[in-house]
């Protein structure tokens, strides 16, 4: 499904070097490491927001290394949900698709939230809206950049379980980056420590 070969990137120092990642259909990988080690940069390279120094990325057997981000069909969920406060929940979902809003909101546990103002949402609700929007675009892979870290522990645990179950039911492969090893163990099928990729 997603095949990353010999990915390398450095700024003042090496972030990752000749890193290989293979992700099968429905598989969830967690990438761990301390803050500032390059986890977010890796996700940005995979989805096309940053350039690699070297290496190749394949999706369903097709090379996408030099493809623009908008044609890769890779979803990205951030630590802080990127929502537009002047739009309703449904208005935010319309940025991904004009259809199936009710179904998407039911899927993420927010039935009936379509007409809500975004500024009235809690942190967990906002993250669920961002997830619904990402999934409405039917991404071939979903990348998650510490989406649970800003939530309290009980809310974070529920969201981890709900998002994992949803991704598994859709057979959507995903990569989570986190510095929290417990979170990684709960959410993923396997774990990669990014520091291990630096040779």
Task: Please state what every model-predicted region is.
Residues 117-121, 125:
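Conserved ABC ATPase signature
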Residues 131:
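Hydrophobic anchor residue at the start of the ABC signature
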Residues 63-80:
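ABC ATPase NBD coupling module
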Residues 47:
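Helix-to-loop junction immediately C-terminal to a conserved catalytic motif
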Residues 100-113, 119, 164-168:
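Conserved ABC ATPase "signature" region
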């Amino acid at each position: 499904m997603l095949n990353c070969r010999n990915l390398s990137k450095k700024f003042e120092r090496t972030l990752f070097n000749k890193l290989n990642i293979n992700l099968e259909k429905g598989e969830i990988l967690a990438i761990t490491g301390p803050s500032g080690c390059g986890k977010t940069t890796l996700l940005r390279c995979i989805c096309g927001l940053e350039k690699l120094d070297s290496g190749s990325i394949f999706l369903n057997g097709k090379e996408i290394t030099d493809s623009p981000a908008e044609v890769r069909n890779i979803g990205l969920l951030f630590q802080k949900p990127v929502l537009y406060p002047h739009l309703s929940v449904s208005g935010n979902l319309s940025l991904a698709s004009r259809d199936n809003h009710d179904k998407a909101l039911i899927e993420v546990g927010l039935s009936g939230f379509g007409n809500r103002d975004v500024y009235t949402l809690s942190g967990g609700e906002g993250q669920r809206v961002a997830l619904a929007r990402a999934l409405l675009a039917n991404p071939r892979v979903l990348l998650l950049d510490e989406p649970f870290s800003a939530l309290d522990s009980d809310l974070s645990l529920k969201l981890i379980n709900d998002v994992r179950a949803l991704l598994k039911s859709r057979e959507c492969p995903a990569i989570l980056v986190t510095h929290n090893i417990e979170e990684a163990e709960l959410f993923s099928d396997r774990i990669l420590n990014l520091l291990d990729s630096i040779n």
